[in-house]
A protein has these predicted regions:
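Short acidic-aromatic active-site loops that bind/stabilize oxyanions
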Residues: 43
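Active-site microenvironments of hydrolase-like enzyme catalytic domains
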Residues: 1-35
Length: 311
């Protein structure tokens, strides 16, 4: 039987190292082999190797390593392999900023496994204190793609100050060769214990609903005659188009495309809604959130293709 085993998993990108804004890019676990989470020699050796792996990985992704929950699950593969006598090391691959295909995380997996093989081959892991394993922070699910802090939102005649958490969700195209985004409001309110891959300090900024451009476009060619950035600065977020190309899964400009038959619902900011609205300060529109992506309207906008199509 193998003395050591590695159990590799993909993990949500929304895990963070507990109490920090850093993603849990890699999470380790020496799985429990019983409900009591006892530590025998087999599990202890897995812990020692993980401590060494973490010490190496901190050089490449400082603060971005977490410790996965060790609650016992009798149906889990890793828990059973540990129980059967192989020192099992779970490696979870989470998120890394600007790495949607997890290419950087693949490198960190390589470094992790190579460092483990080294310490096992040399036997140096035997001298490691397992108390160091407990110092690796737990991973926690408190991370979102975009966090807007301290915004003012008017509702039923009252003004409220709140944070807005947004996740940019991938939707596979047919054939699974590419994807587009359909973002959602993940949470609202006091989110001081949550973090964002991108964070906007919004004190003094108000949430402003987007307007529908009054002229209906005949087809996609009409977009060439529009200054879409100026339309955004003027508060327009939706364009009606009579003939929307069938192959379009998302808009080619930073405004949502709407068919004549589609009625846009009055603006409400709720959990689960598509996050699309403007931010304004001192009676001036300064930013726009389009399908969960924040754009600064004082800067040039190019190659933005993440707006929605409502047929």
């Amino acid at each position: 039987d193998a003395e050591f085993g590695f159990n590799l998993h993909d993990q949500s990108t929304y895990y963070n190292a507990e109490l920090t804004p850093k993603p849990a890019t890699i999470s380790y676990l020496a799985p429990a082999y019983n409900y009591e989470k006892e530590i025998n020699d087999v599990r202890a050796d897995a812990m020692r190797v993980i401590v060494f792996m973490n010490s190496i990985l901190q050089k490449y992704a400082p603060g971005q390593v977490g410790r996965y929950n060790d609650s016992f699950e009798p149906r889990a593969f890793g828990d059973n392999i540990q129980k059967w006598g192989t020192s099992t090391i779970l490696i979870e691959s989470g998120g890394y900023l600007d790495d949607p295909e997890k290419q950087e995380i693949r490198k960190l997996n390589y470094v992790s496994i190579l460092s483990a093989i080294y310490t096992i081959a040399t036997g140096k892991y035997k001298d490691i204190d397992i108390a160091e394993y407990e110092k690796i922070p737990h991973n926690d699910r408190k991370l979102v793609d975009l966090k807007l802090e301290g915004l003012t939102y008017d509702l039923h005649g009252n003004s409220y100050t709140m944070d807005v958490a947004i996740n940019q969700l991938e939707v596979d195209e047919e054939g699974n060769n590419d994807f587009w985004y359909s973002s959602r409001v993940y949470d609202l309110g006091d989110l001081s214990t949550s973090y964002g891959y991108e964070t906007f300090r919004g004190e003094g900024y108000s949430i402003i609903p987007g307007k529908i451009y009054p002229e209906e476009l005949a087809d996609a060619s009409a977009l060439e005659n529009l200054d879409t950035v100026q339309l955004l600065r003027d508060g327009y977020l939706y364009l009606r188009m009579k003939d929307i190309p069938e192959e379009w899964v998302c808009s080619t400009v930073p405004l949502h495309i709407v068919s004549p038959a589609n009625e846009i619902e009055p603006f409400d900011l709720w959990v689960g809604e598509n996050p699309s609205f403007f931010l304004g300060k001192d009676d001036q529109i300064t930013h726009v959130v389009v399908n969960g992506f924040l754009l600064d309207l004082s800067k040039e906008i190019s190659d933005f293709t993440n707006a929605m199509i409502y047929r």
